[in-house]
Amino acid sequence: MNPNFLDFEQPIADLQAKIEELRLVGNDNSLNIGDEISRLQDKSKTLTESIFGNLTSWQIARMARHPRRPYTLDYIENIFTEFDELHGDRHFSDDAAIVGGIARLDNQPVMIIGHQKGREVREKVRRNFGMPRPEGYRKACRLMEMAERFKMPILTFIDTPGAYPGIDAEERNQSEAIAWNLRVMARLKTPIIATVIGEGGSGGALAIGVCDQLNMLQYSTYAVISPEGCASILWKTAEKAPDAAEAMGITADRLKGLGIVDKVIAEPLGGAHRDPVAAAALIREELSSQLAMLKAFDNDALLARRYDRLMSYGL
């Protein structure tokens, strides 16, 4: 099984393997097999459109966790210029599961904050698999208050299974760190745009998710608990995760229908990992447009709009 493809994508993987084999044959024997390659490429595109046009909620949850999916630093590289990363919470340490710093978007200074997972084993461990400890959220809070002080918009990228539940995190008051961020973000006198780029897991996501505009990528998720966690509570087995995912309404389209999400950003065919540069361009377009819209509000109007937005949840 090709690790770059999930199990429901294997028919696509098989076609891609055939295309690569034909390319190698053509290179070795100088044969003109372009027509056959074009036919298989068209077939692969049609098959991909068919599969991705009918994804279940559980399949979308798995897409949100795809090991090749672009992470925050990938989007920073492809969307912004002059990124200068800032470190530390000034209380305990620097948490690598949260990255943040100042950059430019359309030549405007902005503060970027996001979860960061890892690719290889060592980086995954260093980033704690994208699960922040309290010092990560306190670093984020420090950067957000800095952004308000220097009148910079805040752009957050959400991609976490959740806040780290370890004993050391609890000893340093994980719940307080999350709650404090919610309080601070609700009152910040600067525009905040949050974009869910992968997993939006519970309070770990919400701690950098209070905003004026919430975006979700097409194959991202946002929920109070993982489907496996929900299934383990309700049915006492994680095998019911597909049923839980469907019942919870974790997908971008479902949340858009509920009024939680403002904008669903389309992904390239097959997911953002198939064309990270194109995915970044789509996000950049939305961020530029939304920033221009939010800059039209003065501070009082911006805070009133944010408050009304939060109070509308669940109505």
Swiss-Prot record:
Residues 40-293 form the CoA carboxyltransferase C-terminal domain. The keyword Lipid biosynthesis applies. Its main location: cytoplasm. The keyword Transcription does not apply. Pathway: Lipid metabolism; malonyl-CoA biosynthesis; malonyl-CoA from acetyl-CoA: step 1/1. Acetyl-CoA carboxylase is a heterohexamer composed of biotin carboxyl carrier protein (AccB), biotin carboxylase (AccC) and two subunits each of ACCase subunit alpha (AccA) and ACCase subunit beta (AccD). This is Acetyl-coenzyme A carboxylase carboxyl transferase subunit alpha. It comes from Pseudomonas syringae pv. tomato (strain ATCC BAA-871 / DC3000). The gene is accA.
